[in-house]
């Protein structure tokens, strides 16, 4: 902020024309005169937007200090944009001016209308303090007392043990505990995580060199897998009763609610200018859904209100050195559900329900999740029986982190994490109890007793789509025969004709399989059968059906099942039944590549 301070015999002004940013003002302020006053010409700047209260307080102190020194009790606050070329948004500027006015207690204050063209005249006194300038900078706040955390292990029996004294027979849970206790260096490795090689080798996804670091491009197979994961998350939320919505990807930082919520993530944001407005690209779907909830007239009967959005792209400006394949990016896909609840009792009930969705996704995706429950110590002490109920419900130990005070919008959350091959967590599903955002975004519901702030649950039933695929690939990299879940495999059945004369029957088989909503292709290339089968193995195709002379005569197929290695003769219907049993009730999309491999381009 820039201030130009003048001690004057008088100042008088008259508004001439309203700009598009003009505030509504009473007639008495459109023309005014004040004598024996300190005039503060004020220009709010872009950097003020993240610390409106602090900047206004510092400005009021500076103005009051000079007014006291020149022995006047009269102050004129005069908006004056010409003091800076880096102006704050009009909304922020007006907020700051109004705040300064309210803070100048003990002074007679005249604030000239904001956003109006004005003519003015003044007579400046000639003493040494009659003309002064000040720059107000948002100061770094003193470091808060470090939040202390303690780790415990809560068992299904209700026994809680300091994490340092807990001995687990589950190697993966033990690794999660070690990581959270800061002992992960014992397991760290500088080697590239195997999913990075796999995502390229399997023609799923690659880095995009023409974009910013941490932005990916999805190849046809990867796009298909990603879309299926998106469909899965959508169905999980909708079948649970959530209503899908879609909201913008950028938000105005001059909104105090937006800037305060954004500040929770520090500097990890993409920011841009839209004309004179400072905007940010969202890092989650909170902003749009909270704005939607704010605009709704909610009554008690409307709750719980469940909204779901696939944030097709969320943005976090992670440090370049932290960017890792599918594990951490700057642009990612986040399924996001928010539930407005009547009170904490209802929020705790739906917390458990939504945590079930997270564990279900692990089963459906063939990913083993470990649970980390984080809470303030005060919340845990008040809700100990409920936390014990969670461990009992899911029949597993929970790593519990207790924080000495609340530093986020949540009082508790549960993260479900898989392990990568370096034995570090990949956090995927999460459920959080938010006690702050309803008030910040002015989200209310009405009861007979009056207005109330709802408690809001933040839930991602699967976690970020990229991380989900990362967890799947990292887990499969350790398997003797790696494979995607059959419902996610780009090609679920590959038909391999021994020679060209079997191609027509191969087409007939593929047609039947395709009509059963199974993704199928035909390896019609001029290669040996062994090479074709090996190629299918490299692509992790779960079912390979070879057709030779004997199979065509018998109208059968020589099928190899990838995971089991089992080889058996099947009819087309038997193959279809076998595959359908594995993909039943899971999302389906058709093959998006040429069905004939001879016509299929290579992307890697």
Summary of predicted features, one role per range:
Residues 363-386, 483-505, 569-570:
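Conserved, charged catalytic cores of large soluble enzymes
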Residues 360-431, 602-604:
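Metal-assisted phosphate- and nucleotidyl-transfer catalytic regions
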Residues 75, 98, 514-579:
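C-terminal structured "cap/appendage" subdomains that terminate the fold
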Residues 480-532:
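Generic long, charged, amphipathic alpha-helical segments
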Residues 116-119, 250-254, 288, 407-409, ...:
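Short acidic loop-to-helix transition motifs that present clustered carboxylates
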Residues 102-103, 361, 389-394, 507-520:
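Short helix-loop-beta junction
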Residues 276-278, 294-296, 305, 309, ...:
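A translation/RNA-centric and nucleic-acid-associated enzymatic feature enriched
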Residues 1-30, 34-54, 63-66, 76-90, ...:
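Auxiliary tRNA-acceptor-end handling modules of aminoacyl-tRNA synthetases
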């Amino acid at each position: 902020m820039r201030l130009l301070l003048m001690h004057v015999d008088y100042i008088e002004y008259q508004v001439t024309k309203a700009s598009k940013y003009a505030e509504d003002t009473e007639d008495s302020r459109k023309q005014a005169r004040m004598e024996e006053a300190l005039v503060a010409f004020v220009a709010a700047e872009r950097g003020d937007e993240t610390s409106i209260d602090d900047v206004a307080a510092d400005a009021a102190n500076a103005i009051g200090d000079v007014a006291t020194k020149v022995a006047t009790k009269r102050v004129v606050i005069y908006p004056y944009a010409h003091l800076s070329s880096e102006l704050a948004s009009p909304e922020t500027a007006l907020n700051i001016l109004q705040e300064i006015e309210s803070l100048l207690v003990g002074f007679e204050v005249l604030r000239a209308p904001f956003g109006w063209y004005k003519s003015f005249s003044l007579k400046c006194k000639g003493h040494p303090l009659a003309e002064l300038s000040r720059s107000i900078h948002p100061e770094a706040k003193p470091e808060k007392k470090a939040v202390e955390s303690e780790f415990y292990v809560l068992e299904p029996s209700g026994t809680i043990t300091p994490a340092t004294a807990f001995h687990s027979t589950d190697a993966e849970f033990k690794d999660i505990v070690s990581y959270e206790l800061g002992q992960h260096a014992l397991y760290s490795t500088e080697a590239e995580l195997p999913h990075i090689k796999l995502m390229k080798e399997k023609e799923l996804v690659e880095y995009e060199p023409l974009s910013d670091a941490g932005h990916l491009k999805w190849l046809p197979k990867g796009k298909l897998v990603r879309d299926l994961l998106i469909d899965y998350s959508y169905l999980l939320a909708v079948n649970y009763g959530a209503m899908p919505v879609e909201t913008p990807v950028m938000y105005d930082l001059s909104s105090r609610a937006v800037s305060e919520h954004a500040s929770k993530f520090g500097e990890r944001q993409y920011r841009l200018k839209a004309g004179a407005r400072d905007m940010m690209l969202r890092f989650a779907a909170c902003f749009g859904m909270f704005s939607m909830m704010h605009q709704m007239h909610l009554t008690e009967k409307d709750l719980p209100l469940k909204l779901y959005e696939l944030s097709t792209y969320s943005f976090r400006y992670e440090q370049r050195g932290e960017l890792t394949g599918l594990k951490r990016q700057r642009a990612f896909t986040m399924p996001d559900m928010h539930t407005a609840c009547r009170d904490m009792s209802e929020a705790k009930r739906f917390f458990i329900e939504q945590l079930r969705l997270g564990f279900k996704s692990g089963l459906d995706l063939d990913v083993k999740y470990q649970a980390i429950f984080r809470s303030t110590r005060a919340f845990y002490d008040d809700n100990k029986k409920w936390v014990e109920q969670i461990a009992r419900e899911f029949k597993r130990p929970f790593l519990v982190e207790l924080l000495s005070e609340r530093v986020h919008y949540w009082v508790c959350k549960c993260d479900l994490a898989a392990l990568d091959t370096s034995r570090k967590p990949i956090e995927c599903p999460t459920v959080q109890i938010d006690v702050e955002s309803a008030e910040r975004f002015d989200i209310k519901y009405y009861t007979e007793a009056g207005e109330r702030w709802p408690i809001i649950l933040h839930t991602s039933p699967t976690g970020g789509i990229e991380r989900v695929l990362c967890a799947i690939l990292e887990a499969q990299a350790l398997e003797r025969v790696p494979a995607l879940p059959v419902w996610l495999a780009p090609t679920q059945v590959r038909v391999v004709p021994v020679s060209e004369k079997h191609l027509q029957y191969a087409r007939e088989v593929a047609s039947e399989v395709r009509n059963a909503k199974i993704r199928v292709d035909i390896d019609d290339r001029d290669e040996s059968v062994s090479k074709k089968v090996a190629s299918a193995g490299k692509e992790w195709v779960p079912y390979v059906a070879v057709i030779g002379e004997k199979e065509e005569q018998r109208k059968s197929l020589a099928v190899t099942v990838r995971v089991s290695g089992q080889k058996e003769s099947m009819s087309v219907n038997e193959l279809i039944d076998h595959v359908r049993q594995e993909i039943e009730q899971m999302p389906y999309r058709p093959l998006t590549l040429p069905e004939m491999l001879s016509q299929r381009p290579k992307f890697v």
